Curated annotation (Swiss-Prot):
Source species: Homo sapiens (Human)
Stored CDD domains: BIR
Description of how the protein assembles with itself and partners: Interacts (via NACHT domain) with APAF1 (via CARD and NACHT domains). Interacts with C.violaceum needle protein CprI.
Domain NACHT: 464-758
GO CC terms of this entry: basolateral plasma membrane; canonical inflammasome complex; cytoplasm; IPAF inflammasome complex
Any one biological process term the GO annotation gives: negative regulation of apoptotic process
Keywords: Apoptosis, ATP-binding, Immunity, Inflammatory response, Innate immunity, Metal-binding, Nucleotide-binding, Protease inhibitor, Repeat, Thiol protease inhibitor, Zinc
Underlying gene: NAIP
Domain remark text: Both the BIR and NACHT domains are essential for effective inhibition of pro-CASP9 cleavage. BIR3 domain binds to procaspase-9 and the NACHT domain interacts with the NACHT domain of APAF1 forming a bridge between pro-CASP9 and APAF1.
Residues spanning the signal sequence: none
Name recorded for this polypeptide: Baculoviral IAP repeat-containing protein 1
Entry binding sites for Zn(2+): 315, 318, 335, 342
Record PROSITE patterns: BIR_REPEAT_1, BIR_REPEAT_2, NACHT
One Pfam family linked to the record: NACHT
Amino acid sequence: MATQQKASDERISQFDHNLLPELSALLGLDAVQLAKELEEEEQKERAKMQKGYNSQMRSEAKRLKTFVTYEPYSSWIPQEMAAAGFYFTGVKSGIQCFCCSLILFGAGLTRLPIEDHKRFHPDCGFLLNKDVGNIAKYDIRVKNLKSRLRGGKMRYQEEEARLASFRNWPFYVQGISPCVLSEAGFVFTGKQDTVQCFSCGGCLGNWEEGDDPWKEHAKWFPKCEFLRSKKSSEEITQYIQSYKGFVDITGEHFVNSWVQRELPMASAYCNDSIFAYEELRLDSFKDWPRESAVGVAALAKAGLFYTGIKDIVQCFSCGGCLEKWQEGDDPLDDHTRCFPNCPFLQNMKSSAEVTPDLQSRGELCELLETTSESNLEDSIAVGPIVPEMAQGEAQWFQEAKNLNEQLRAAYTSASFRHMSLLDISSDLATDHLLGCDLSIASKHISKPVQEPLVLPEVFGNLNSVMCVEGEAGSGKTVLLKKIAFLWASGCCPLLNRFQLVFYLSLSSTRPDEGLASIICDQLLEKEGSVTEMCVRNIIQQLKNQVLFLLDDYKEICSIPQVIGKLIQKNHLSRTCLLIAVRTNRARDIRRYLETILEIKAFPFYNTVCILRKLFSHNMTRLRKFMVYFGKNQSLQKIQKTPLFVAAICAHWFQYPFDPSFDDVAVFKSYMERLSLRNKATAEILKATVSSCGELALKGFFSCCFEFNDDDLAEAGVDEDEDLTMCLMSKFTAQRLRPFYRFLSPAFQEFLAGMRLIELLDSDRQEHQDLGLYHLKQINSPMMTVSAYNNFLNYVSSLPSTKAGPKIVSHLLHLVDNKESLENISENDDYLKHQPEISLQMQLLRGLWQICPQAYFSMVSEHLLVLALKTAYQSNTVAACSPFVLQFLQGRTLTLGALNLQYFFDHPESLSLLRSIHFPIRGNKTSPRAHFSVLETCFDKSQVPTIDQDYASAFEPMNEWERNLAEKEDNVKSYMDMQRRASPDLSTGYWKLSPKQYKIPCLEVDVNDIDVVGQDMLEILMTVFSASQRIELHLNHSRGFIESIRPALELSKASVTKCSISKLELSAAEQELLLTLPSLESLEVSGTIQSQDQIFPNLDKFLCLKELSVDLEGNINVFSVIPEEFPNFHHMEKLLIQISAEYDPSKLVKLIQNSPNLHVFHLKCNFFSDFGSLMTMLVSCKKLTEIKFSDSFFQAVPFVASLPNFISLKILNLEGQQFPDEETSEKFAYILGSLSNLEELILPTGDGIYRVAKLIIQQCQQLHCLRVLSFFKTLNDDSVVEIAKVAISGGFQKLENLKLSINHKITEEGYRNFFQALDNMPNLQELDISRHFTECIKAQATTVKSLSQCVLRLPRLIRLNMLSWLLDADDIALLNVMKERHPQSKYLTILQKWILPFSPIIQK
């Protein structure tokens, strides 16, 4: 157990702060701030975690196993971390050293785990190679001490004497009691945790908590006389049979191994380096700079290999790097001077010493003495399995040893490990993969459960006939070669039990070929150096000490007969076979297997590891690669096999200056490499890609990602064709029928895109029609941004002169189709394969509901980018231009859209746009709304009394406000972290000089920023100068106007609109605005300042057409405006507030002189001559919108004038009173004549209440009505009238029906209304809320009627029902209704009051 000590306050920063500016640019956010927040979070987690030596994690294999659940998106691979002493804690990405407890969370791209370990805890005992109990991942329990105990058996026959030897038992094995070990016959040797049986001489080490010494003794040395004297045969058999792994293996298999490691395993983090062999180090110098002053032989001799960068070399053992070599340098001396603790150097030194230093043995010499050959048998109970024999007695034995040496030489040669994955170039060969462990799972042939395995477990379980299955290019060959290499190198004791290992490729064999012939052809230098008889004798003698690694297996009938017999009759030969087979070829071999090893998807961190090794000279490209796939997590899965990594490498090597690194580049390169590899069968490949593309396309549009044999047959896919398996995977586990998937969902989309282009580009009409049919299935703009985004990105990147215009036309017409705009359905099957799309679609739906215009603008620009990318990629810009120009007509785009090449090639298209939107956002904190003022709006004496069952209908305001503040803080933190890079004005339209065509209207939207920097000022000057008209929208940005004075003064004639909200202008800023000669619109709101210079000088704005003033407090603008201002004849929009104490004559005169007025809003508490106001408004024949607020309204003169407003579209009389029934009746009849009315917000009062049914009946004449609101004016009869009018054909375009605070409607009235309401096909929002003092405790029948009603409203997305008290059953019923509703993904039910007090709970 780990020592339970609290973590110290050690602060660790893994970030390289010099790289943070570069990361900021790549991430699009403030990396410095992000790093600070991450470090704070990590420090909090670090403080919670326990420290102290963790004996449970001293085994590297166990540490490696903890990374099974590690996040694949990482720059570090598990082997590097485990070898550096770390295990995965499971807390975020945290890893911890078993020895010094260092906790790291980050995985740097430029530094390895061992480097960060040395950097933060250089005094860690593990790093200093102290005896801290580390167990190397390939180490074994059986030890081979060629010594015997001093005094022989007699001295330790007594348990007490054995126990006394444990007085210095290491601290890291305190979980194993010396009493139990001594009882089992063991004596402590004094070396690490190795013990030796006093009777049989067997040595065991690497003890871990939970080990049973008797079981270990029985497993490894079952013939021990002492063991047999203490345990029965049945007990010994039970111990052996219950042992996990190492079937039929005893200690003698390891003790008598012919394979000996040439190098020590002192440095755990490099114990399987391929560069442990000098020949392989030499081979790494093939690209060594010729001008270098140092010879490669000397460098390789000193343990150094070439990194491929400049003249930098690295030690395979200690990992140290050396560079800048000069004439006369001695690599060995420099290595020794810089890295004196290097295990490789220490081993060289100890090997050179003739006489061992006896003093260094200490206590070990007292316990052990060297065993001579004459008395060796006295320490080993049973002789070796393969005894040394005279050559005449056993010729096979000598031949076997010779064969062992030849095989080891073959497997450690550079040629063996160097094989190009795609047979195109040698840039990415198998040797670059040997350091990356594959992700492997084991499954018993009769059990569905898979168990993830790490390599040490795989090696321990090798037995009889096993297969490793995986997709094409999944790394099967790499795994087999790695096993052969590790065996030959001697650095994997787990494999030392095999005396011979044969790696044989079955792809180049003949059925009648003999085993010796195959071995000679593939592995041995001399033909005929081993005979068939010799091989047969060796196998018969060695049995399970022979391992066959059989690669490229296809089917049993196609392999050599001799190999077939080894598989089919393995019970006779008892050899071990590991057979590599593609998943689709494994069926006929399964009958001979008990265990299958399955290679899973290639982890993303392996991809990063390989790219880091090969392209460490271009870290910027690697960082971009990491950032891209970090932002697009679903695309990480495309690196499914090493073949895709090979495709990336081939592309990067071939195009070193091509910046592309995304999924499109990966897939294109992969297909290109397949094409090059299969030149001889180009037509077959083409047909395979086409048929698989057909399957992919059909599956994509039907949200199908798994296919059966029938699906493949229908699409013409041949599953037996090897090329098919380069595109698809076959799965057979626990299925009556196999099923197939493409290598990844994204790859399926890519192939589907290729097929769509092929169909549209075909000369056959039926193919073109089929392509258009598929294309038209893309009928939702939202899906183009979300679910179809990747697919369309692939389509747009594939060139096609015929398909280009068709695709462009379809995409650009999507946004003009209202039905398609609202067709935003979501397919759950698709989301199973891309769950991250779900959140994206929720955000898009929210944007669509809250701000349809912003949604529409975003989708429009997205489609434009896709369309133009398609046009340019297919070289069909001229043919596509008519569609593009039609699309641009009257549209608003963002400033970034002008960077598109199209606006450079066709700048005249700018004139078609309505405007360009340029947002500028700062980091100021917007004023937070204070809800405490609402407490004064509620009468606390009216606190509702409710049952406990209905408590969920209310939420305390303080709790709600606290949650809201927390969310606002999170949003602010995120927004503050966003890096607001200045717009790029170097491409597209901005390359034009001079700019003959200008931006028709520039909308500058400024929020939360006071002052801009010089860079932004220069950008504004450039953009302003390229704009015909400029509109400024300023919010909470005091001082902004002054900071952009140079830009405004250069373009003041272009500014036509200025909107000022929540800020006070300085005197200088007001003076600057007054110099704008072309200002047509002025809006001022959200401030208590009257802008003391602007309003008295409004007459300076000679072109002013729109004036909107909404000031806080009792401020009357018309009291300060100049007398000349009302004489203007061009006001079109007037939104104003005045106070009672001022003469309204200026306002009346202004209206009189504004015949073009079309929007009029007035807020006033008293108007002395309302009749004259209405008379003047009647003269405004173009008036389309009227809104009256506050208490100045007079019903009689208004109704008298109302028939004259024949163009009226919006009438808002919210809060106005109609007490007179006669006037209200006239009002009702007149409403029926306003045929253009779209929004009707009705007044209140007794008069309206009495004529409500008449008003509703008159609404049948209002065919354009979209919004209808009744407030305090309905009862049971009138509300049911709404349903009757709807049934008879009224309200067909109604989208919003507001029926709130109508307390005279009873529950029965609502129920009747719900039961009758139907035929409102466009209703999106229904409000039936009540005041909290007028709650309705709904009966089950009412809730049921409501649910049925909502189901009849197919487009309803919001239901407001405050003060409806619903119990758990009612809520459950509504939830069931939501799931069944056509808008189930969008329908929101608002049922909870937010109050400054809690209701009284009635018990």
